[in-house]
Every structure is written in structure tokens, then in C-alpha cells.
A protein has these predicted regions:
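Internal intein/HINT superfamily modules and their associated LAGLIDADG
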Residues: 1-267
Length: 267
């Protein structure tokens, strides 16, 4: 474990200053909701302090192989950025050992509770809502889909696609792009499809991608695909909006969208 950017430990005084500063900023719930529904986690489990007294350890953590989003989270919420490497094994039947790498940043205790309360209204995946409710000890209200703004839906989609999705650009005379989001939770993808259509006018397709084996049994992976083409105006405005400043947080995926937007504009 290597600490790349270290912040002081939490104290009541430091947290008071932190929360006061955060009240003066615009918390982008949809952006972090997209990340937490894909790659973020909430945990709540028993630990012991130095006096062997048990307590519930609460944590909201983001861990990725890409540094950029985790570093942004670290700086935004003043928590240390850590780099980890460890040995792990791929699932059956292609079982082999390799070195996994991840950048990690997490909020603990009072800051974890604060963050979870703020992001909960913008969580869409039921599994993540359940973990968040366990951390908080109660279930807050989710934001009604009817009340989401187009900007909120765009910001959520941007980070969800960065987390569990991909962008693929192809073609020469006609330039095309696929924005694909994957999940084994078909209801989650259905909800996103509905939001994108209602709030952004984005058309998409939802289909079965593959089945795979887990310890819990056979699961199905689904794919939500948003298609864009230089010969078809549908969805081009959506892809153009993704490359605006502050929307996407991962340059290697943003560059794919920029490639499409730049070439489609010239066509």
C-alpha cells in the first residue's frame, strides 16, 4: 500500500470546518451517484478500537484501476488517496493468478454518513440503496424520477458509463459511436433507459449480452446501448454534452467521445 496524497485524520474540529466548507459548494449528487452505483461501495461492520471496545465502522469507498476519478474524490472530500497492489485469481474456468492494481479513497465515520445521506437520493441501483440504508441505519427518500433535471441525468449517465461502460468509435465515411453500459441488474438498466429517454430524449436499446458463472450460480449480463452516427441526428446532442467541462471525469473514455464529436461535426 502506498499513500499518494495524505490528509490528516478526522477530528470533530476538522470535520466541523469540512462540513461548513461543503455547505458553500454544489454537491454533485448525480455524478457521485453514477460512480457509486457502478464502482463505489458502502460498508458497515464491527471493529474494535485501541481499548478493545467494539464499534460500527462505516465507510463509503471508491476503488478503481484509473487514478483520475479517485483522485478527484480524494481532493473534493479531503481524504487520502492510496494505491494498492495484490495477488488475485480469475474466476473459473480460466483460472490464473495475476497482480490486481487499484487507486482507493474512502470516507469513514461521520464523513461517510454525511456523504451517504447526500448521495442516496441519486442512487438508482437497489442493491446500492440497500447497502447505503444499512450504513445509515434508516432508508432516506430517493429522488423521484419525475424530479430529475436533464443536467442531473446527463451527469449520472456520464459517470455510470465511465464506471461500468465503454465507448466504441468506428467507421470512416459514416462515423458511429456506441455508449454501452453493462449490468446483471436488468431493472437498473431499464430505469436508466427510461430516465435518459424522458429527460434527454436519448434513444437506446436494452439486450442480453451473455451468461456467466458465479459462486451464487448462473447470472445474465445485460447491455444498454446508446448509438450515435454522423448521418443521424438522434443522440448527437447527448454525446456533445458529455465532453463539456466537468461532466466526464476519466480522460481515456472522454477522448473516445471527443473523437466522435469532432469527426461527426466535420461530416
Amino acid at each position: 500500500m502506498t499513500i499518494l496524497n495524505k490528509y490528516p485524520k478526522q477530528t470533530k474540529e476538522r470535520n466541523k470546518v469540512f462540513f461548513e466548507k461543503q455547505e458553500l459548494t454544489n454537491f454533485d449528487g448525480p455524478k457521485w451517484g453514477g460512480w457509486w452505483d457502478t464502482d463505489g461501495s458502502f460498508s458497515d461492520y464491527k471493529r474494535e478500537n485501541k481499548r478493545k471496545k467494539p464499534y460500527m465502522h462505516k465507510k463509503a469507498k471508491l476503488a478503481l484501476k484509473d487514478r483520475q476519478p479517485v483522485e478527484l474524490f480524494s481532493k473534493t472530500f479531503e481524504t487520502s488517496l492510496i494505491y494498492n497492489e495484490w495477488k488475485t485469481t480469475t474466476p473459473e474456468p480460466y483460472k490464473y493468478e495475476y497482480i490486481a492494481k487499484a487507486y482507493v479513497a474512502g470516507l469513514c465515520a461521520e464523513k461517510a454518513v454525511w456523504f451517504t445521506k447526500k448521495v442516496y437520493p441519486y442512487l438508482i441501483k437497489q442493491e446500492k440503496k440497500d447497502f447505503a440504508a444499512k450504513l445509515l441505519g434508516y432508508r432516506p427518500e430517493s429522488k423521484d424520477f419525475a424530479d430529475w433535471t436533464p443536467q442531473e441525468v446527463r451527469n449520472y449517465l456520464a459517470t455510470a458509463l465511465e464506471g461500468d461502460g465503454l465507448f466504441r468509435v468506428r467507421g470512416e465515411k459514416t462515423i458511429c459511436i456506441d455508449g454501452q453500459l453493462f449490468s446483471s441488474d436488468v431493472q437498473y438498466l431499464s430505469d436508466i433507459k427510461y430516465l435518459a429517454e424522458k429527460k434527454l430524449g436519448v434513444t437506446s436499446t436494452l439486450s442480453e449480452k451473455c451468461t456467466y458463472k458465479t459462486e451464487e450460480g448462473i447470472k445474465t449480463k445485460y447491455k444498454l446501448c446508446i448509438y450515435g452516427s454522423s448521418k443521424n441526428p438522434n443522440n448527437i446532442g447527448f454525446f456533445q454534452s458529455l465532453v463539456k467541462d466537468g461532466v466526464m471525469t476519466l480522460d481515456r473514455k472522454k477522448q473516445k467521445v471527443q473523437e466522435f464529436v469532432g469527426q461527426a461535426w466535420r461530416k
